[in-house]
């Protein structure tokens, strides 16, 4: 992006943070806040039911501390909430953030400390900027400094992981008005939107992650969530997604990603290890990505509106489908779409990798695939 003058830069940071707040706006029910407060330790700012020493790789227990402070922050800053402007709740947020900084919980799964935790902290701090009282500058600064030190660097990762780390770089850059970090983060969001023979968007319009694994769903979900999210934040600014990147993204989403979803359910062949998760084929929540794209890629807005109607259940699974047969020569995957049915074939191939297992997920189907 072109350099901005001081006034323009200030306005852009405020605009980006306003869009981020709108994206995550929530009004936590008072009952949930009251339940969380029952286990709040007034002495040190911890929660008595959270195991801060746990390092388990999935459903990491200490993250509950951040999730509760996150809800407290939105309750404190949301007009109409019974805790809006509540000074006692504000004091608990401050003490809770101080406790988290001093305790510095660590997870054996890097994802929690480099993606989940810093993303939530960034959003929370952006929201708290709207409060009647501001958290101490020293507390905000040291929290953000640790996020920068321990939260990873997007350039060291690929695909969805790169985008997810870049997101909290964006949050931190807005809070600190650091144009260099903001530019780096945006580059790392947009740079993966290229055709490659490595991990990422393939020349046949499929998507690979973790080597040569077909991951149209799973990691495909994540990278689309992150890219469309950032593209909406930067829409109408000098940081907007480049047109050629938007075209590649839209082609993948319209012709591959949403083509593997029948009605609201995704074909299981493209889900990776996530196939073992309950109700994972239900992709109705991905209507959000299509809604974003209808605004970003207005030339194909009607196509996205049809996708949204199918995912929301307002139209049947056949609505606006055009018969199409596609063989993905990089993925060794075939997709056949008709108004009345859809089927796919994922081939046994030496050019691709079979579905993985990891983080306690998918050991059974991985073993069966080996048989």
Model-derived regions, located:
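N-terminal export leaders
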Residues: 1-2
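Low-complexity, Ser/Thr/Pro/Gly-enriched N-terminal "stalk/linker" regions
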Residues: 5-63
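Residues that form generic nucleotide/phosphate-binding pockets
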Residues: 19, 23, 35-40, 146, ...
